Structure formats: C-alpha cells, structure tokens
C-alpha cells in the first residue's frame, strides 16, 4: 500500500478539512430544478413562497445541498486527490451510512462543508474504505443544513486491476 494512503489512517477522529463558502442563489436552484425535472414552487417560485411558504422565500432542494458534497470535498480535501496517485490511485463514491437534511438552505444562503475522518478500513489489497463525517454549515445559522456519514473507496494498484478485470476493460 502507498505510504501516504496508509498514513491517512492516523487522522481517524480528526477534522481533515473545511470547504470555502459557496453561494446558493436562485439561478443555481432553478438549474437543479430543470436538471431533475422538479418544478416544486417551494424552490422555484418566489411569489408562491412569499404568499404560501413558511419560509417566505425559496429554499434550496435538499438534494442540491447533498449533490454539492463532491465539490466541497475537492475544495476542502484536494490533498486527498494525490493519495495513491503514484500507483494510478483514485477515489470512488461508495454511498452513505447516514444522511439527514436538518435545516433548509435559504435562497442566497452561503454554505460550506466540514469533514472528519471517522473510519479507515483496508477491505483488501488496493482497496481502502473511508467513512467521513460531514456537516454542511449555513452561514449565520446554528443548525446545519445536512449531516452525513459518507463512504468513499480509495483504489490503487491491485484494486484497480481487480475492478478492471471485473468490468471487462
């Protein structure tokens, strides 16, 4: 196993990065609505929200907030992209053990993500599964937008060859 990847295990239980603030404006919310074919007025109709929503303004889709996690991870943890790079290594999204949408993100709200390494497990040679604690903060709010336990796989050398063989590449 590549030494940098093995040494990452020493960070279990520690904060490992925070992304910069990111603006969630109406244009981004509208693009997400279009991409997901979801015209819910709670997200895309400011007039409807002013009259009928308890928030009195549009809010971001919870799935929009969730979908930003990959971007936030690259912003906060860019140094991770080099783990295993000398062996052709790369990371894969492995899903979630837990995810909660705690507080809605208001239109024109700014959010950022905080990451903690919770677990590091060598599944087999060339495959390391990491569990990250993630909290998405909303600027000026006490409750987070999202809390999650996010799983990722780091693939190097032998793991890559196994995946390549399995998928007939």
What annotation goes with each model-predicted range?
Residues 94-98:
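A beta-strand/beta-hairpin structural motif
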Residues 1-92, 159-169:
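Hot-dog-fold acyl-thioester-processing enzymes
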Residues 1-11, 101-169:
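HotDog/MaoC-like acyl-thioester-processing domains
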